[in-house]
């Protein structure tokens, strides 16, 4: 069995995977609320006392959470976890930018896209919206923009008259009230952002 995890600013997901690369069990945690008690409670789902863990690998953009999970697994189950950026990734990927400045989540996305044939622009919608560029298995860098939900929540937190809003597609650009106008701004605004950035990257990598 293998444990793999993705520790993000908003959410942490941890998976138990069998020898056929099939997800057996999954844990989801709010990254803002993670503590020792919660980690201990959630990992009971994996029933780790009765199985053998061959490897444990995380990609993490919150070092403190990784350290806490690694400490817990090592103390209670003698399982040592590795963080993606600490591995020798140059054996898989030719990285042409400052390695220390790239998040583990973005590197994981790039590694997942390697196939020796195609070039990729990889989009990831999380706390941040990221674009990463892979050409002939060479990681060229990317773009980081504010995430949709982060921006939407910040707007409602800072603007007194704008309520919490769930993002939905709007058929028309012009909103008829505050809520539909905000939805339109975010839906069409981010659609335009994505189209524009993707097109600019394509031009820059021709």
Task: Give the predicted meaning of each segment.
Residues 32-35, 112-117, 140-183, 188:
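Glycine-rich phosphate-binding loop plus the immediately following alpha-helix
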Residues 90-120:
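Conserved phosphate-binding catalytic cores of ATP/NTP-utilizing and phosphoryl-transfer enzymes
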Residues 1-3, 7-89:
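N-terminal glycine/serine-rich phosphate-binding loop of ATP-dependent small-molecule kinases
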Residues 48-52, 116-118, 204-206:
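Glycine-rich phosphate-binding loop signature in dinucleotide/nucleotide-binding domains
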Residues 79-91, 127, 161-170:
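Acidic-glycine-rich active-site phosphate/pyrophosphate-binding loop
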Residues 1-24, 113, 118-138, 155:
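Gly/Thr-rich phosphate-binding beta-strand-loop-beta motif of the actin/hexokinase/Hsp70
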Residues 190-204:
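A short, acidic, amphipathic alpha-helical segment used as a generic capping/interface helix at domain edges
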Residues 50-102, 137-148, 176-191:
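Short beta-strand-loop/turn "lid" adjacent to the catalytic site in phosphate-handling enzymes
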């Amino acid at each position: 069995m293998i444990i793999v995890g993705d520790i993000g600013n908003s959410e942490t997901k941890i998976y138990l995977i069998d020898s056929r690369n099939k997800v057996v069990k999954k844990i989801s945690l709010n990254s803002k609320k993670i503590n020792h008690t919660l980690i201990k409670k959630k990992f009971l789902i994996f029933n780790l006392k009765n199985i053998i863990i061959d490897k444990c690998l995380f990609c993490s953009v919150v070092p403190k959470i990784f350290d806490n999970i690694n400490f817990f697994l090592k103390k209670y189950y003698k399982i040592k976890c590795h963080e993606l950026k600490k591995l020798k990734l140059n054996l898989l990927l030719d990285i042409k930018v400052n390695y220390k400045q790239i998040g583990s989540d973005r590197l994981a996305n790039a590694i997942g896209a390697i196939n020796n044939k195609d070039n990729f622009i990889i989009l990831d919608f999380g706390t941040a919206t990221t674009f990463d560029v892979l050409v002939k298995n060479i990681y060229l860098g990317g773009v980081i923009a504010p995430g949709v939900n982060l921006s939407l929540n910040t707007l409602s937190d800072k603007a007194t008259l704008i309520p919490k809003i769930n993002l939905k597609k709007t058929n028309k650009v012009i909103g008829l009230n505050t809520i539909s106008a905000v939805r339109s701004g975010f839906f069409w605004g981010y659609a335009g952002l994505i189209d524009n950035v993707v097109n600019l990257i394509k031009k820059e990598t021709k």
